[in-house]
A protein has these predicted regions:
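Structured-RNA-binding interfaces characteristic of tRNA pseudouridine synthases
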Residues: 1-247
Length: 247
């Protein structure tokens, strides 16, 4: 049989997973996909993911590829996998792609959304997919502060101190902040994100929204290139990888 490469669009509820990437500490999305594909194809399968989301982070449109000699057509893998995967992982789409397609080494725009429930008490139905903030957030201040981040900047202040990456320059193409009822939606798109970058941006915006920090502090935080100058890292559960668009 000839080897082929198949692309998957993967959605998952990250609540019960220790992130995407295989690790010894607990079950991960990548591990479940590897095991399920290996059983389906009767061969050893290892997927390559576009975004290695953290423990507790969700996804609507992560991308993964794998190579297989299976006779199953590329577009049929979504149905076949969804019959076997746990209910908190679903394949939105599958297709055969060029043998040299790599989900991490292409020009992309990634879009993340962070949800904040801003009201007097939490809601059980939202607790796994948003972070709860009791005190009122000033969304207009948050919008004005976020606008400073659009464009190409050195985001070292918004990168986890544990990260070993040398180049911390990234481009944010768009940030929108909308409040629908009691839920605040922060949507951020860009050509790549540093480790914990979105969650640190959100934590900083929450400080501004609460009036703890002035709304004009973003420029000085960027210029500092110092993680300690930005806000805390927001909880993982409020973050969802919405889409990865290949350019």
């Amino acid at each position: 049989m000839n080897m082929k490469r198949v692309k998957l669009i993967v959605a998952y509820d990250g609540t019960n997973y220790c992130g995407w990437q295989v690790q010894i500490n607990g079950i991960t999305v990548e591990e479940v996909l590897n095991r399920t594909l290996s059983e389906l194809c009767h061969e050893d399968i290892k997927v390559i993911g576009a975004s290695r989301t953290d423990s507790g982070v969700h996804a609507l449109g992560n991308v993964a590829v794998f190579d297989t000699e299976s006779g199953i057509p590329g577009e049929k893998f979504s149905f076949a996998l969804n019959q076997r995967l746990p209910e908190d992982i679903r394949i939105q789409e599958s297709c055969q792609v060029a043998d040299d397609f790599h989900p991490r080494y292409c020009d992309t725009i990634k879009t993340y959304e962070y949800k904040i429930l801003n009201r007097r008490f939490d809601m059980p139905t939202e607790r796994l997919y948003s972070t709860f903030v009791y005190y009122p957030l000033d969304v207009d201040k948050m919008k004005r502060a976020a606008a400073v981040l659009v464009g190409e900047h050195d985001f070292k202040s918004f990168c986890s101190s544990r990260s070993q990456v040398e180049n911390t320059v990234r481009t944010i193409t768009d940030i929108t902040i909308d409040k629908v009822g009691d839920m605040i939606h922060i949507r951020i798109s860009g050509n790549g994100f540093l480790y914990n970058m979105v969650r640190i941006i959100v934590g900083t915006l929450m400080k501004i929204g609460l009036g703890i920090w002035p709304e004009d502090c973003m420029e000085s935080i960027l210029e500092a290139k110092d993680r300690t100058k930005a806000g805390p890292k927001a909880e993982a559960k409020g973050l969802t990888l919405v889409e990865i668009k290949y350019l």
